[in-house]
Amino acid sequence: MTTLDSNNNTGGVITYIGSSGSSPSRTSPESLYSDSSNGSFQSLTQGCPTYFPPSPTGSLTQDPARSFGTVPPSLSDDSSPSSASSSSSSSSSSFYNGSPPGSLQVAMEDSSRVSPSKGTSNITKLNGMVLLCKVCGDVASGFHYGVHACEGCKGFFRRSIQQNIQYKRCLKNENCSIVRINRNRCQQCRFKKCLSVGMSRDAVRFGRIPKREKQRMLAEMQNAMNLANNQLSSLCPLETSPAPHPTSGSVGPSPPPAPAPTPLVGFSQFPQQLTPPRSPSPEPTVEDVISQVARAHREIFTYAHDKLGTSPGNFNANHASGSPPATTPQCWESQGCPSTPNDNNLLAAQRHNEALNGLRQGPSSYPPTWPSGPAHHSCHQPNSNGHRLCPTHVYSAPEGKAPANGLRQGNTKNVLLACPMNMYPHGRSGRTVQEIWEDFSMSFTPAVREVVEFAKHIPGFRDLSQHDQVTLLKAGTFEVLMVRFASLFNVKDQTVMFLSRTTYSLQELGAMGMGDLLNAMFDFSEKLNSLALTEEELGLFTAVVLVSADRSGMENSASVEQLQKTLLRALRALVLKNRPSETSRFTKLLLKLPDLRTLNNMHSEKLLSFRVDAQ
């Protein structure tokens, strides 16, 4: 967005505001030092503010008081609570939000009204214009960390990332206006502002403007001036000339993120996998809900022991006798699997998300290895479909006869077990408890995609807003997976078998600091398994667990509550139909919902505590 300001004094101000809407709006030197950017446009709301046609980086606005305008409130980041809260806590180039680092603020040199902050000896000029800091609006001293910034904001950002400073929580809902005179009041909001305008540890760190960047900015400014001069005569009042449609570089305010338990994995893939909300469909009958959910549950969920050919008990017997377990084609066609425990957790998380999105195709980046032992960790192997298998257990093959694609068809004695989950605490000696817990959480990653796909097939789920869809998935995925994998907890033997076909005792895992959470998981699994739910009942209960109207951050709780009631009616009808004599069975099933919420909170707190300790 570009704004122009003209007055009777010499010079004037031209302010280029990043299309992401993250730079403060200023239309006069006085507003450069105002305590709140909101005041600059609140005083100009009367008259006929009209928008210029879009420029290469945004649109121009007209101010009736000075024949030029200011940025509409909806596009000013300091006026939108969502802008400050939507930025992440890690410095990454993803914070450009479609706005190139060259989107800038400049001011015509006017020493009587624009002065650098204290300690600033260098003023970055471009053809007689003074560049302004994208964070606070002070005079920029150069091109620092990917944007034009003043010495104060450059040093502040450098200290923040080098010392990994955790700033105190903002007392104003992370909605502080960051300008020159108050930039030190709230350090958390200032750091988020740095990230939102595009500052990154991976970006340019030196003060000189690259030649290509300088040429691009000059062309951008000249084009904006030409548009302003040519279009002034044809401007109309706002009531008769609608605002132009936002360009690809303009980003409107996004809803504030909903506080939710620490997610198991990165959920950035949800918006891509979910569909936009559609027009409300007719409310389905109870029979339709039961049949649709049961079918989705039966066809979508594959990461469960009942789909792997053997039950936990049978597997333990086979494993004790040395016979490899049987596997089904569904298991072989896994669409992505965890990396080995030897990988860095963050890198593993990135690979998981890429695998879930189908971004990584073809052979693995790891060289294939074939250990000769009875059970080893091995590297990822591509199967014939291009999907990678993660062989947690590799049963030895005759020497020199290893198949090229890592899969020997028709020979159950020499088979790679594709593991949808890969929890292996003993994969490397000397591993910390934090690393083991990270692997424990990461082990759920491959099943997340199935949860998303299952949600899309719940009648009425896609009628919800995309924000509410994502919020429900973020908050409820762990609970859904807990229901899915409850059968993997053997209460009698006090063991848990992960889908890697590796069994661990409760005592063994409890010694690693997992006792409280695992005890709660065992108790829940015992209670849920005692109800002996059918496949249809389990599918409907899974849908009820996911669609919970009391999740924090919902936009339209009424719609979610209505969908939840529909699912509850269907579940009640099905339970009473299957066992009409057990009238308390439905009530007992509903009592598992608060137990799941407790487990979710326990897992989030445990994972968060380990992450804090690891820093």
Curated annotation (Swiss-Prot):
**ZnF bounds (NR C4-type):** 133-153, 170-194
Region annotated Modulating, chain positions: 1-129
Q: Show the CDD domains listed in the entry.
A: NR_DBD_REV_ERB
Q: Where is the composition biased (Polar residues)?
A: 1-12, 35-48
- Record's note on what induces expression: In bladder smooth muscle cells, exhibits night/day variations with a peak time at circadian time (CT) 4-12 and a trough at CT16-24.
Ranges for the region named Crucial for activation of GJA1 are 49-285
Q: Pfam families given for it? A: Hormone_recep, zf-C4
- In what way is this protein post-translationally modified? Ubiquitinated, leading to its proteasomal degradation. Ubiquitinated by the SCF(FBXW7) complex when phosphorylated by CDK1 leading to its proteasomal degradation. Ubiquitinated by SIAH2; leading to its proteasomal degradation. Rapidly ubiquitinated in response to inflammatory triggers and sumoylation is a prerequisite to its ubiquitination.
Q: Which GO terms describe its cellular component?
A: chromatin; cytoplasm; dendrite; dendritic spine; neuronal cell body; nucleus
Question: Which positions does the record annotate as the modified residue N6-acetyllysine?
Answer: K192, K193, K401, K592
Where Phosphothreonine occurs, residue numbers? Answer: T275
What family does the Swiss-Prot or TrEMBL record give for this protein? Belongs to the nuclear hormone receptor family. NR1 subfamily.
Q: Which PANTHER family match?
A: NUCLEAR HORMONE RECEPTOR, NUCLEAR RECEPTOR SUBFAMILY 1 GROUP D MEMBER 1
**Which protein are we looking at?**
Nuclear receptor subfamily 1 group D member 1
Report the source organism.
Rattus norvegicus
Q: Which gene encodes it?
A: Nr1d1
